[in-house]
Amino acid sequence: MDTQALSDLAAHIEGRMPDAVRSWQIHVGELTLLAERDHIVPLLRFLRDDQQCNFETFIDVCGVDYPERSERFEVVYHLLSMRMNHRIRVRIRTDEETAVPSVVSLWPAANWFEREAFDMYGIQFADHPDLRRILTDYGFEGWPLRKDFPLTGHYEVRYDDLEKRVIYEPVKLAQEYRNFDFLSPWEGMTTVIPGDEKAKEG
């Protein structure tokens, strides 16, 4: 779709769902809505059922972490209209305590995507039929895609041949983290940096 058609679509959505849409923008040929968290289910139902929108195909829902914000998480929904041949991205914001309404009632395929966002970020989804971890182990501590999660994690999980079972141990680093100097010509940089002009002459 061209920019004008996307602008017309955004105006149509905003006109029909004024309480749900906070703002919208067109970037790289795709329409993105910033929506109110508590209106996400009615908004997505409208996007699916309205004949001008017809976003019947649910593609994805994922989380994004912005730890500097008071509402640190964004939940991002991607929808596709195969009949109209266009896509839309819908973003909502939430904090660590406030649950986001689940959209499993609209698209059952959202089930595992919401579980993944819960497992990786700790984002809560209200009225989800089975909100439990899906990728990490049962006793896993923390939320691994949060930007404040330690790079090494908390525990090392390995199979022990002597005990014939999986064991958990605190992480032990064999060496300290390396601090790479990306401005050093010895680290593979091909451009000349100030003061290094003689290196090219020799």
Swiss-Prot record:
Q: Which GO terms describe its cellular component?
A: plasma membrane
Enzyme class comes to translocase
Q: How does it sit in the membrane?
A: Peripheral membrane protein
Extract the SUPFAM superfamilies matched here: Nqo5-like
Which GO terms of the molecular function aspect are on file? NADH dehydrogenase (ubiquinone) activity; NADH:ubiquinone reductase (non-electrogenic) activity; quinone binding
Lineage, top-rank taxon, reads Bacteria
Q: Does the keyword NAD apply?
A: yes
Q: What is its EC number?
A: 7.1.1.-
Keywords, in A-Z order: Cell inner membrane, Cell membrane, Membrane, NAD, Quinone, Translocase, Transport, Ubiquinone
Q: Which residues form a coiled coil?
A: none
**Substrates-to-products reaction catalysed:** a quinone + NADH + 5 H(+)(in) = a quinol + NAD(+) + 4 H(+)(out)
Name its cellular compartments: Cell inner membrane
Q: Where are the transmembrane segments?
A: none
Q: What does this protein do?
A: NDH-1 shuttles electrons from NADH, via FMN and iron-sulfur (Fe-S) centers, to quinones in the respiratory chain. The immediate electron acceptor for the enzyme in this species is believed to be ubiquinone. Couples the redox reaction to proton translocation (for every two electrons transferred, four hydrogen ions are translocated across the cytoplasmic membrane), and thus conserves the redox energy in a proton gradient.
How is this protein organized at the quaternary level?
A: NDH-1 is composed of 14 different subunits. Subunits NuoB, C, D, E, F, and G constitute the peripheral sector of the complex.
What's this protein's family per the entry? Belongs to the complex I 30 kDa subunit family.
The protein depicted here goes by the name NADH-quinone oxidoreductase subunit C
Question: Gene that codes for this?
Answer: nuoC
